[in-house]
């Protein structure tokens, strides 16, 4: 049995399948669920023509706030019948303040969950991840298609001997203990194939994670994300666990990297920590 504090960050346009998946996660992990509905507003008009645009801007804000309030009421009504402990909060702010809003609510959370609604809003998503990863230092579980499985799922761990990958593994143990099988994959052209990840296998076994396997997969000049996608497909992974931002965040933002590519092309539930 686990007892996690789960923070689900969503937009006012959250779908029914998404909230059902979050509730299932809270039930499976015996968790307390906090839902944070975040709406982003346009920057207030400034300059010589403020009087010409302020009325439309105010009307847009009123419409947005009304939608947020409606979503909060609907979520509270739905969650009241689920039998799980919960609370619902909301905020309406400019996108450059989203990271701080998420940080305040995520500091005492064990896990942040994000669904399809935010994955389709790149600016808000980046601000939410900034608040979760770089301010609150909390792992994030992405559920792009509301397809999380908690009844003996197949889990793939993308393993590197880095602090970020280690953090992801430690934080995901409650999920790994629910797994029917856990496949550890190491993407490396030069790694010894005979005894991959003995330390990780020992650690997971000591935590009660069962049905473990590990293998090294060569990169062969392919992108790491493609190698991981192919392997996840081959083993039928319902969930991928991996570290986030092994390189400097600025470097990944400028040049791209595994974390950025994975987040931009998510197709299956993915647990990431740094």
In which residue ranges do the predicted regions lie?
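Small/aliphatic-rich secondary-structure junction motif
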Residues: 1-56, 135-138, 150-218, 237
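Short histidine/acidic/glycine/proline-rich micro-motifs that form metal-
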Residues: 12-13, 61-62, 92-93, 118-120, ...
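Amphipathic coiled-coil/heptad-repeat helices and related helical stalk/stem segments
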Residues: 18-19, 98, 125, 165-168, ...
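Gly/Ser-rich helix-loop-strand patches that form or flank binding pockets
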Residues: 19, 26-28, 101-148, 231-274
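Structural beta-alpha unit
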Residues: 33, 40, 77-112, 207-240, ...
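Short, ordered loop/turn segments at secondary-structure junctions
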Residues: 38-41, 93, 117-118, 145-147, ...
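A short acidic, glycine-rich active-site loop
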Residues: 55-70
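P-loop/Walker A phosphate-binding loop and immediately adjacent motor/lid segment at beta-alpha junctions
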Residues: 75, 80-81, 85, 123-144, ...
